[in-house]
Regions:
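C-terminal transmembrane helical hairpin of 12-TM major facilitator-type secondary transporters
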Residues: 242-279
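A membrane-interface helix-boundary motif in multi-pass transporters
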Residues: 122-134, 315-334
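Hydrophobic core of transmembrane alpha-helices in multi-pass small-molecule transporters
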Residues: 7, 75-93, 264-279
Length: 351
């Protein structure tokens, strides 16, 4: 069940990026879909929700999905209802995931999430079906969820570590989803370099670009997961690995903001996954230096995700076609902030 929940979250996070591209929506609206998903993901961390309320969330989502399927409405109303569905489903699924003990290996769980990303373009063609399937999976997950009382928990921040994690997530979500959209649009406007893909391109350039963009993103995720797995085991000099890897990410992101060649841009994007995997060393160092608690780390991660996406939405409203390049620079700045934060934290620990 845990792996299935992981897979559906991947579809919910990226599926409506493909939907928005297929329907030529403004970039800021496209980015609001993953923002709604991550707002829901943040909700269970500091709130603990009772099972009855989670069933209400699922029921409201089901009703909204039925309305979206059968009731004609203005596009803006459809947009708001879809964002509501993504928010509620994300809150339910994340709460259930937190409450279910999973015996599967972490790599397996994460690859199921990547599989969800790979399947997410289906939402461009059958968005209501995806919502119905997600609601069914959420209801099934709730049957295995142990009820809890409502309470609000204030996260116990771990000083510089929490801030560094927040900046890392902020840098990543400043550019990731907007880059998926930008690459998808670029690939929909130029014939593929691989001739065998030419037929798929001519049938539907928008669909081809959307699928190709998502699959390249999946490539960055696979490289990230594998590199993180390797970096956490290869060396005891965790901070050296972090500084080198994140400095490389800083340089790569700045370079990407000036590159106009799509192929070179994609290659560098894949390299961000390799170098970005070094972030695992922060958690490793945190476990070595203080009593480790996953909750504040998770909260910092989710807060960074939301701040990064909010920045991307805000910039895309005012700068439109220039916003992907601007957000790459913002992502580089976030990486630099995370590096400086860890340098200061390490210096304080030496005193």
């Amino acid at each position: 069940m845990f792996c299935l929940l992981n897979m559906i979250t991947g579809i919910l996070e990226c599926g409506w990026i493909s939907f928005g591209l297929a329907h030529a929506m403004p970039l800021w609206q496209i980015l609001c879909y993953p923002l709604a998903y991550y707002l829901g993901k943040l909700f269970p961390k500091p709130f603990s929700l009772p099972k009855k309320l989670l069933f209400v969330f699922c029921s409201v989502t089901l009703i909204a999905a039925v309305i979206l399927t059968f009731v004609p409405m203005p596009d803006i109303v459809r947009f708001v209802l879809t964002c509501l569905c993504l928010f509620l489903l994300s809150a339910v699924i994340q709460t259930v995931k937190d409450g279910i003990k999973s015996g599967e290996h972490s790599l397996l769980k994460r690859f199921f999430r990547v599989a969800g990303f790979a399947l997410s373009p289906l939402a461009a063609f059958r968005p209501q079906i995806i919502l119905f399937v997600a609601v069914v999976i959420a209801f099934c997950g709730l049957t295995k969820y142990t009820d809890s009382e409502y309470h609000f928990t204030v996260p116990d921040f771990k000083g510089g570590y929490s801030i560094a994690i927040l900046f890392h997530q902020l840098h990543y979500f400043c550019y990731t989803h907007i880059t998926i959209a930008a690459v998808s649009l670029a690939l929909s406007k130029q014939p593929p370099v691989i001739d065998a893909l030419g037929y798929a391109f001519t049938r539907s350039p928008a669909a081809f670009g959307s699928i190709a963009g998502i699959l390249i993103f999946c490539g960055t995720q696979i490289i990230y997961i594998l590199s993180e797995h390797i970096f956490s085991r290869l060396t005891k000099k965790s901070m050296t690995v972090f500084y080198i890897g994140q400095t490389a990410v800083f340089v790569i992101l700045l370079s990407m903001s000036f590159i106009t060649d799509t192929t070179l841009f994609i290659i560098l994007w894949l390299f961000t996954g390799l170098c970005g995997g070094t972030v695992c060393t922060i958690t490793k160092k945190l476990k070595q230096s203080v009593k480790y608690d996953k909750a504040p780390t998770t909260f910092s991660e989710n807060a960074g995700c939301i701040l990064g996406l909010l920045a991307a939405v805000f910039v895309s409203v005012f700068f439109c076609t220039y916003s992907p390049d601007i957000m790459l620079v913002c992502g580089a700045a976030g990486t630099l902030a995370a590096i400086l934060c860890m340098i200061i934290t390490m210096q304080k620990e030496k005193k």
